[in-house]
Amino acid sequence: MKLQAVMETLQRQQRARLQQELEARQLQQDSSEGRTPPSAGYPGNGSDEAEPEALKIQRAQAAALAAMRAAAAGLSQQPSPAASEEEDGESMASDEEDEKERDGESERYQDMASEEEDLKGKWDEDDFEDEGEDEYEDMEEGIGVNEAGRVGKGSTLPPKHSSQQAFPSQRSQGAERAGLPLSGHPQLQDHGDWTYEEQFKQLYELDGDPKRKEFLDDLFSFMQKRGTPVNRIPIMAKQVLDLYMLYVLVTEKGGLVEVINKKLWREITKGLNLPTSITSAAFTLRTQYMKYLYPYECEKRGLSNPNELQAAIDSNRREGRRQSFGGTLFTYSPSGAPSMLSSPKLQVSGLSLGGAALNGSTLSSMQKIKKEEDSPISLAMPPRIPVTLAGHSMVAAQVAAQAAALEQLREKLESGEPPEKKMALGSEEQQRIIQRTIQHNLLAMTAQLPMNIRINSQAEGRQDSAVNLTTNGTNSISMSVELNGIVYTGVLFAQPPTSASGTSKGSSNRTGSIGGGSSNSQAAPPSTPSAPNSNNPSP
């Protein structure tokens, strides 16, 4: 519909132009032949004939403007009745021209530009550069047409002059509107830059501190010279992170390393007016400070160096792991076994498994217990006792040693004497502690965890010994003790908690060399009960 309306408008304009040209040619022919025009002798009649012709052209132009506005606005309105009657009369007179124009649409499209330029030179109201003119321009054109219609007879030049004055403004407005799509893409790019600049602007205008601008300028120039320019401002809690205040707060506390070691991030968070409910606020602030401010701190203040920073970070990580590991190390308790109490740790300077009467001799060791004040107490094996464990055996050994140390500590504290005064324990006490440890801890754990423990120890009498513990099931433990090259083997069975003494059934096999010789002996049959570690082989 729009294209059809435009084509009809152009056709009407072309007809009006052809009529004007025909009239001009006719006047030229009359003047060249020397004949007087009909209007020469009768000026009044000539003016009367000219006025209807001018009004006719003006009406045609008004109808063209109305049709163009309807086409641009997407409306299918009909022109005025006078224009439609004139259009019908002209269409009947020029049917042949319409047929030719319909047949040659391509030629008409080519002549469109030239015809419009000619019409603009004659009648400035016909400014039809495009179909998509807005309502404001159409309103201005309508006002111009109405004023031209109200002028009356013999006054065609004033509206033409007024339209010439209005045309440059309309053309400039059209150029501005035409320039809007062209300048749209640069505006989008500027919008992205504006957001980036707006972040910097917010950072500079967070408060009225006069030192803020000086600090930020110095910081950005330093990072630029360093080769790591600040390309973006960090955002935290949906707001720009105040780098200036963060630097001031951290340096007041002694620098980044001091803040990490003393765990002062909560105070830093409050100083920045950030919500304390932020997840990992300390980690976020630390990483942002390391990225944007720590090189500047090292350069300007020299409060620490990167090596100290790395050491502080590693120490913080180790401390966190130690806290989580220490609370769960000695809390294992299988179902059906008595649960062990978690208590302060002990530092043991010497610990050995002994106290059993083997071959008429007693293996005893000195055990020193030291209680440290106001400090966590850790359990440590002496360096002269190498321990070889596999899989979960280390955990079992630590549990056994922990149970023994706890029992010793309870007895010493109940007696009311300081731990430093009792330096040694008797062989019977050690035997009872070892038996209880094996039955209540190792046996309970090895019911689910296979283990093979070998403890080599060298006593003061230069006697080499080794202990091997192997689980045979849920109710027994195979035990092998090596002393001075002699191997003692046996089986330890589970005993109810009510009995005071343990029961051991098994056999011992001695293989060794004494004074360059070797001897093998077989102990009592397995069915003969005996006390633990009391199978004495015959020489």
Swiss-Prot record:
Keywords: Cytoplasm, Developmental protein, DNA-binding, Nucleus, Transcription, Transcription regulation
GO terms classed as biological process: regulation of transcription by RNA polymerase II
Region (Homodimerization): 450-471
Protein's UniProt keywords contain Transcription: yes
Record domain ARID: where: 209-301
Record's compositionally biased regions (Low complexity): 55-73, 519-539
Region (Important for nuclear localization): 405-448
Important for cytoplasmic localization: annotated span: 495-502
Gene Ontology cellular component list: cytoplasm; nucleus
Domain called REKLES: residue spans: 404-499
Xref: SMART domains: ARID (SM01014), BRIGHT (SM00501)
Subcellular location as annotated: Nucleus; Cytoplasm
Residue ranges with Basic and acidic residues bias: 101-110
Pfam family, one: ARID
Compositional bias ranges of the Acidic residues kind: 84-100, 113-141
Region entry Disordered, spans: 1-190, 497-539
Free-text function comment from the UniProt entry: Transcription factor required for smad1 and smad2-mediated responses to TGFbeta during mesoderm induction.
Subunit organization: Homodimer.
Name of the protein in question: AT-rich interactive domain-containing protein 3A
